Amino acid sequence: LRSFDNDLRSAVQDGMIHHGVEIINNTEDVSIAKTDTGVAVTVNSKDGKSVILADVVSLAALGRKPNTANLGLENVDVKTHNGAILVNADSQTSVENIYSVGDCTDNIQLTPVAINEGRAFADTMFGNKPRTMNYADIPTAIFTTPEAATVGLTEEEAREMHGDAVKVYRSSFRPMYYVLPNKQEKTLMKLVVDPTTNRVVGAHMVGDHAAEIIQGVAIAVKMGATKADF
């Protein structure tokens, strides 16, 4: 979660640990060896300790890249970067009559983004309603346990853009749903605010249904809502 807000990352980590997930930080390398029963995954930490995480099965989540290797793009001079097709604001590639949208490009890899890119292309080329895709303030969800979601700038990004006077509002609480059964589940809400206009430039949440809740928050952020509006 390197590109996400630090408070969101910490809250996700704390929640996962609370749910029994072991997280080992500051590791130097991971080795995987075949055994009689499956595979052994060993993590070597910076302090010289080795920990065997699994001795039966291993799942490696190493990211993904566009599946463009066999499309013959090099034969028509379509430019790529690390397999991703390079496009301009109109989804046009380096070849004038070839366009590309979705996860095969170098833009944000989210399903709603790909759908809207396709609609923008269709409106421009065939609907006489030219428009470009707006990549600002796109809500994003992480389906961890606990669930997390975000829209707009992280606190760090906001400070780079607006200086250290950026206002940050946090609230960590136990939802009413968990009070009666006395479960220790926490929800984090965080707003990042432009100090000059009081406009909310970033919103971050960790907790139940964060992915759905952030959709409504994103509308407010896109419309320029201020802290007072919240």
Go through the PLM ranges and name each one.
Residues 45, 88-89, 194-195:
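Short, acidic, Ser/Thr-enriched surface-loop or helix-capping motifs
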Residues 31, 77, 90, 190-192:
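Short, surface-exposed charged micro-motifs
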